[in-house]
Amino acid sequence: MISIKYRARLLAACGILLTCVSPALAAERLRALIVDGQNNHGNWPQTTQMMKKYLEDSERFTVDVVTHAPKGEDPSFKPAFGNYAVVVSNFGHGAASWPAETRTAFEDYVRGGGGFVSVHAADNSFPEWVAYNQMIGLGGWGGRTEKSGPYVYYSDDGKLVRDTAAGPGGSHGPQSPFAITIRDAAHPITKGMPAAWMHANDELYDSLRGPAENMEVLATAYCPKTKRHEPMMMTIQYGKGRVFHTPMGHGNDSQECVGFVTTFVRGAQWSATGAVDVPVPADFPTAEKTSSRTSSR
């Protein structure tokens, strides 16, 4: 039987331990911000909540969401970017320009070392915003042409090509599963992943083009239409800021792919810190088989 005196000492010790440990554990959580509100994909409210859940479930992030007005410009859209370690964009094609003050604040935030993640149609947004296109490296649609920058892809013989040929930026075929090929297995985002793995049903973006400055292609997917290996994961250095860009993630089912979930969360952590400790899960897809987790949406 434990004496009252011993029990009191034990409880006191536990209290000291919790006092010491809890703040440290809380400090490990990074603050993330998802911005959304205008997207040509009608499921954007669901994908915002899915991505929020993925980040929070990793136990690495706390997440806030700031939503732009649904139509036209929104003078009140002024997120406090500096309060966050990473910003995730779930905007899409045709999104109205942000207020000039907000654009400048975002540029300063990323240039000064803030993290940024561009998901799927976020690379359709803001074709006239020079700094934004430098951040995402490559974009599509919105009138992007050879004036926007080169096409970037891998050839069959494994060479990275910067193609300045004339033509529009951005295209995709019917949705289907497709294979992802890792091009840099040593990068913190891709380290430990299979050399090739199957991504679930999605749009395979092709013919993206843009400044492609300070950009590394981490992974590609072969596009039968272009006969090129199109970028599916990219990192871009913008000033002191780190950017992770994935064109994947069209539909809810696309974002339920364990490959998408893992690369998205790892990409966000890398953008925020430059390091990754989120593990590659046991149910990660293989070269032969996709793997998905049904979400509540």
State where each predicted segment sits.
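Sec/Tat signal peptide C-region and signal peptidase I cleavage site
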Residues: 22-26
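Helical hinge/lid and interdomain linker segments adjacent to catalytic or ligand-binding clefts
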Residues: 27, 31-126
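Extracellular ligand-binding/catalytic regions of CAZymes and related secreted enzymes
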Residues: 27-30, 46, 56-57, 79, ...
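Active-site rim elements
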Residues: 38-41, 165-168, 175-177, 249-258
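Catalytic beta-strand/loop cores that center a nucleophilic Ser/Cys/Thr
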Residues: 56, 62-64, 72, 153-239
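A glycine-rich, often tryptophan-bearing local segment used as a flexible ligand/cofactor-contacting loop or short
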Residues: 96-188
